């Protein structure tokens, strides 16, 4: 996932379009006023094709059509909308989304065919959910962290299923998580099964809009169920008995309210973070502990691998940077190059 980067001129045009839409929605509606009520503020709970569920300030959810002039609308967008009035035969008319407020953040995912697609808007933090089963993968955690740093959205690492650890296993996992604690990331250890550790997580979620990211099988949906107080069948990623991997059931991004305060957007679009569209320099910047050593290498075009005089490699050798993180950095770069090669090969076949 990535955050669209606009030039100053493009940003000015986007802002002007937002203001024009907001002004038009209040002064010159394009639709018959007899069909719709007064403009109101709301937030998009979910998007379905050319329709969206919008929650009003009083907490009611309204199914709305979307104006054709609105090019992009995703869960989490703050909008101006108008409720539909009851028709003559007593059937309620759908409301209409008139305009979209400027976003504070937008999460997108790269797509081979359609470029970059928005997934959700106005996210405050990304909760990276991992687990000791099926496998604790620091490489996957590092990929998520690079995406968060690129998006400039705060991450929280949550390790689930700690109830399955014995004392020795807990000591090992804590040692692994210290790698992230030591470079400033917040790490929480929880169990959605026993609900151990949920209180600190609830506090971290209160008053913020979060999105949970995690591979299949880590118990992300079970954790959301425990936090939301929902029944198992409402949000679930059941684990296959044969593979140990979760079976996805969520089909559209949707915003939920936590009972303790705060919101979460549950989206199938953040199961994996595609990084292949990023430049190598962006990946390097995504490793926060590298920052103090950038620009100190002997050669300006240093690849931070076997290059002589590489300040980052020297920091690894001196124990200032975790070797595991350094290895994952190169794994990410290698996987990016492979994906780009496949994409370029596919493009030449068309």
Swiss-Prot record:
GO MF annotations, alphabetized: GTP binding; GTPase activity; metal ion binding; rRNA binding
Assembly description: Monomer. Associates with 30S ribosomal subunit, binds 16S rRNA.
Major site of localization recorded for this protein: cytoplasm
Compositionally biased spans, kind Polar residues: 1-17
Ranges of residues in domain CP-type G: 104-273
Known role: One of several proteins that assist in the late maturation steps of the functional core of the 30S ribosomal subunit. Helps release RbfA from mature subunits. May play a role in the assembly of ribosomal proteins into the subunit. Circularly permuted GTPase that catalyzes slow GTP hydrolysis, GTPase activity is stimulated by the 30S ribosomal subunit.
Organism: Escherichia coli O139:H28 (strain E24377A / ETEC)
EC main group: hydrolase
Protein name, entry field: Small ribosomal subunit biogenesis GTPase RsgA
Residue ranges of the region described as Disordered: 1-33
Cofactor(s) needed for function: Zn(2+)
Keywords assigned: Cytoplasm, GTP-binding, Hydrolase, Metal-binding, Nucleotide-binding, Ribosome biogenesis, RNA-binding, rRNA-binding, Zinc
Cofactor details (free text): Binds 1 zinc ion per subunit.
Listed Pfam families: RsgA_GTPase
Any one biological process term the GO annotation gives: ribosomal small subunit biogenesis
Superkingdom, taxonomy of origin: Bacteria
Entry-linked Gene3D superfamilies: Nucleic acid-binding proteins (2.40.50.140), P-loop containing nucleotide triphosphate hydrolases (3.40.50.300), Probable gtpase engc, domain 3 (1.10.40.50)
EC number: 3.6.1.-
Gene transcribed to yield this protein: rsgA
Leader sequence residues: none
